[in-house]
From Swiss-Prot:
Disulfide bonds: none annotated. This is Autophagy-related protein 3. GO terms for molecular function: Atg8-family ligase activity. Its main location: cytoplasm.
């Protein structure tokens, strides 16, 4: 717990910065953290603001908005099984996306999603190149699975003995890194707290040694948690915001191009129409990721660190 004490000391000694520069640095101020938390709670009511004992409260945050929490989030299988089982395979090639510091901490594998073949047809793999495509394919697969639930009335795969776990998830504000920080507190099927080693089983192996840490939960007394260390959160958030902004900009430009193509501007070439669409989308596209959406993108990142914990229902929030 030495690292936990050092982390607490660093949080205490770091002065509060109220300046806003999230779009350029990936960091947010305490006020922006509250704003992003309000948006998360509004969009996803399973997340709630909460208070903590007075001696643990941070004076720069409202007393009733010290941290965000969602409880009893299920985990049906361990991270290693989640990444190697089912219908999603990783090929041998790995892609690394370096942040601007060149640390290569944002790591992604090429993913091949195998679709269920029709009669007489072979399976055709669909390559997925970014996190949003993976989320979209996962959502489509969930819908397909829901259509076939009646075929499995007598089969309860998820509730397999003691494999089901529940997690309470806490999001606090880190003053030393100026980003949100995630804490996990897990319980087994009987409600008994998990040991740190057991909770580590639900952390992606690629991140275990880099970012997962055993700490005392800073908003409660005598509670052991696993934290997702925020040292690289800002650079990771910059990458994810860039991806989300790029995807949204492409969608807006394509939509505007289609709309302009329906108008009676006969002397415009297709290239000119595309330029007009980009110009029309420009200001909105530049600001497409708002600061209040920050925690939604943050959770997309955390979902890659804890792949077996099923809380990433944020696909349609942006």
């Amino acid at each position: 717990m030495l690292r936990s004490k050092l982390s607490s000391l660093r949080e205490y000694l770091t002065p509060i910065n109220h300046n806003s520069n999230f779009s350029t640095t990936g960091e947010i101020s305490p006020e922006e953290f509250v704003q992003a938390g309000d948006y998360l709670v509004y969009k996803f009511p399973t997340w709630q603001w909460s208070t903590c004992p007075k001696n643990l409260q941070k004076s720069f945050l409202p007393a009733d908005k010290q941290f965000l929490i969602t409880r009893h989030v299920p985990s049906y299988q361990r991270a290693s099984n989640y990444l190697t089982g089912g219908n999603v395979d990783f090929d041998d090639d790995e892609e690394y996306e370096d942040d601007e510091e060149g640390d290569g901490w944002v790591k992604s594998r090429k993913v091949v999603s195998v679709t269920k073949p029709q009669d007489g047809q072979e399976e055709e793999p669909q390559e997925i190149n970014d996190i949003d495509d993976l989320i979209d394919v996962t959502a489509e697969g969930a819908e397909d699975d829901g259509d076939n639930l009646e075929d499995f009335d007598d089969l309860d795969i998820r509730n397999d003995g003691g494999s089901v776990r529940k997690y309470d998830m806490y999001i606090t504000y880190s003053t030393s890194y100026r980003v949100p920080k995630m804490y996990l507190v897990g319980f087994n099927a009987n409600g008994i707290p998990l040991t740190p080693d057991q909770m580590f089983e639900d952390i992606n192996a690629d991140y275990k040694d880099k970012t997962a840490t055993i700490e005392n939960l800073p908003v409660a007394h005598n509670t052991t948690s696993v934290s997702i260390h925020p040292c690289k959160h800002s650079s990771v958030m910059k990458v994810l915001m860039k991806h989300s902004k790029s995807k949204k900009t492409r969608e807006e430009v394509n939509h505007l191009s289609e709309e302009l193509g329906k108008t009676n501007i006969s002397d415009k070439s297709q290239e000119d129409t595309g330029k007009d669409a980009e110009a029309a989308a420009g200001p909105e596209a530049e600001d497409s990721i708002r600061v209040d959406q920050y925690l939604v993108i943050f959770l997309k990142f955390i979902a890659s660190v804890t792949p077996g914990i099923e809380y990433d229902y944020t696909m349609d929030a942006l």
